[in-house]
Amino acid sequence: FCMRDVSHQCIGEELNGHGRQNANMMGKFVENISESKDYCSYWEIDWNNLPASADYVSDQDFWYNLNANFDVMNACYRLYLWTGNEVYINDPRFEEFFRLSANEYIDRWQLQADKIMERPGVMHEDDARVDPKFKTFRGLPSYEESVRGLTVTGDLIATIYRGLKSYAQIQRLGGNEEAALHYESKVEE
């Protein structure tokens, strides 16, 4: 299961009676964020709860679309609104994923408003590695995967916007108005 696909199809899957599966998949995505992967998670996870071998060699060599963290944030907020399941907004694994995505992830991948237009297209690559499988696919700035050399795209900006708006709302639901206003102001930058 893939971060993008699960995020985009989760409400339909709720309608199909797959709420337990949604919570499980989202939980797997959020619990696998790590500094060693530059605050990415696993793009795809297989039925053995392992990163899909088609997209992952190691924590330094893997496929990742930068939109994914923000799509998961928004999907979790929508799932909470749809189901009332507080796991999506109060579980410590989810809270940590949201916090890291809204801060360290943005910083690590230069997704701030004052840097996003000038960021390099390929980042965080160790040149000492011989023939990395995913050199130009680790940190794709779009879900458009066939165009090389992109540094920023409209779909990335849109997912950042929506993810941070969702996180601000989650903060507000938790009674943290100051944090909600902070993340809303980041959106307006």
For the regions a language model picked out, list residue spans one by one.
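Substrate-binding groove/exosite segments of carbohydrate-active enzymes
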Residues: 1-77, 81, 86
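The feature captures the catalytic groove of carbohydrate-active enzymes
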Residues: 44-71, 86, 106-184
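Long, well-ordered core segments of solenoidal/helical folds
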Residues: 17-40, 81, 94-114, 185-189
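Short, glycine/acidic-rich beta->alpha junctions
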Residues: 2-5, 71, 97, 152, ...
